[in-house]
Regions:
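Selected transmembrane alpha-helices and immediately adjacent juxtamembrane segments
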Residues: 1-31, 38, 111-212, 273-295
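Active-site-flanking structural segment that lines cofactor/substrate pockets
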Residues: 39-66
């Protein structure tokens, strides 16, 4: 019982320190989505084969919504496969607010976002320009659909249809993610204290070369909680930076789930899911090799 109370109090203090940063981050996100959502959608839909650039930049906005929008646009053939993949690979949803709430990790956050954006644009251009002719026409996407025929908006109103203040939506997101962070941190702390930090670190460390591959697989879970899980594991020292990048590159939030629901071709959906995993695993392993070579 004493062990539980010690871990509980330590977890409560650590997570409570994040609240102000989390709330400010979500307040900014809600403002951007509410005031500029339609412009952002128009920018994404109008990119053509160059759509990987706005796709990667918009994917950085920390919420699951833009990956869902991209999935709807791709299913309606408004955007290309390269643009879709750029959005998926750049999406970080809850990981950004979580790292923003930890000033000690701001340098890692900047590095993470630079890597993800550059890599997302690279993959997008590779698919839309270099490999375009090698892909089936039905898989390429783009050009045949119209953005105004696709409804991608998230409701920000109460049960009676009245507009909801953005601070309320931001507070709701903050509390939701706070509860998850607290619960995960508590369970993680109890496991580490019970098993021992050395044993736990040894298990993850023994994955060696395959840790980014496994992290990329975890990132495919169509839930924003997956990115929180991997970020917390990284902060706790149980996950390498290369594995964090791999997991967050495949962590497209609800984007893949929406794709499976709205795109009628299961073969295309399976290919895109596998491609997302392969791209995430590749960049993670690549970073791991570079770090090992430099060291």
């Amino acid at each position: 019982m004493e062990l539980f109370l010690d871990v509980l109090s330590e977890t409560l203090v650590d997570t409570a320190k994040m609240l102000p940063f989390l709330f400010l981050a979500y307040l900014f996100i809600e403002y951007v989505e509410t005031r500029h959502g339609e412009r952002i959608e128009a920018l994404l839909a109008g990119g053509g084969r160059w759509g990987a650039v706005p796709g990667a930049v918009l994917g950085c906005v920390p919420q699951c919504g833009f990956s869902a929008i991209a999935s709807n646009f791709y299913a309606s053939r408004v955007i290309t496969l390269g643009t879709l993949m750029a959005v998926y690979l750049a999406t970080s949803d809850e990981a950004i607010p979580l790292l923003v709430s930890m000033p000690a990790y701001w340098d890692k956050l900047i590095l993470l976002m630079v890597i993800k954006v550059v890599y997302a644009v690279f993959v997008g251009f590779l698919l839309d320009f270099v490999l375009r002719k090698a892909l089936p026409r039905s898989l390429r996407g783009g050009y045949t659909g119209h953005a105004d025929e696709v409804d991608c908006h998230e409701e920000h109103s109460d049960e009676e249809g009245h507009p909801q203040p953005i601070w309320k939506a931001a507070l709701r997101h903050t509390l939701e993610i706070f509860v998850f962070i607290f619960a995960f941190s508590l369970v993680f702390g109890l496991i580490v204290e019970g098993v021992g930090e050395d044993v736990f670190a040894s298990v993850l460390g023994r994955m060696g070369f395959f840790q980014p591959v496994v992290a990329a697989l975890v990132g495919l879970v169509p839930n924003c909680a997956a990115s929180v899980l991997m970020t917390q594991l990284y902060v706790e020292g149980a996950l390498r930076f290369s594995s964090l990048v791999a997991g967050l590159c495949t962590g497209a939030g609800v984007g893949l789930a929406v794709l499976w629901r709205v795109n009628p071709s299961w073969k295309q959906n399976l290919f895109i899911t596998g491609l997302t995993w392969a791209c995430g695993a590749a960049v993670g392993v690549g970073i791991q090799i570079v770090v090992a070579f430099i060291a």
